[in-house]
């Protein structure tokens, strides 16, 4: 009886370990389960040059709060492009694309509409001095569309020899200007309680077609196994 008890524990621990490696994100109730997951990626430009090789950086795909079919987030968590946008897709995981390619119908990229400074070039952008003051700044990749996408189960051999799903995303990125508006901070945030302070909040975007860029995000599903780590 004692031997059986010990064996049962070992089997349970081993099974739990295997499941935890393969299912790092719980997506069982997701309406987009056939898309959803963690994907280790590389990025290729329009000249077919690899501009970012595999190093463990990931894209994560998951359902929106509405949890409806073919509406999902694509989140470049390593901020390689960067990209974090909601996409409405048509098709199936084996062959899909954004249901709309029109800039005005696309959602904002949450990684690039943040208040300044967005990067070092904006370090000297002054804070607003009054309510309603506006500023427009050049920003990359304000919105994006999926031109072509494919997720194929169990066709990739990882660096460690394991089997994983393949990911192919050809995305078009739209750049332009992001406009921010000055709003008054909460009084508890003022350095001097008698002097009002203001901050920038996102207002809207405008599109510059001359700055369009297209990239391929290519990779495979994250396995969690040590031998597949970069």
Language-model-detected regions and their locations in the chain:
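Positively charged n-region of N-terminal signal peptides that target proteins for export
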Residues: 1-4
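Sec-dependent N-terminal signal peptides
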Residues: 6-14
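Alpha-helical interaction segments
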Residues: 11, 28-29
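C-terminal motif of bacterial Sec signal peptides marking the signal peptidase cleavage site
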Residues: 16-20
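First exposed extracellular module after export/assembly in secreted or surface-exposed proteins
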Residues: 29-230
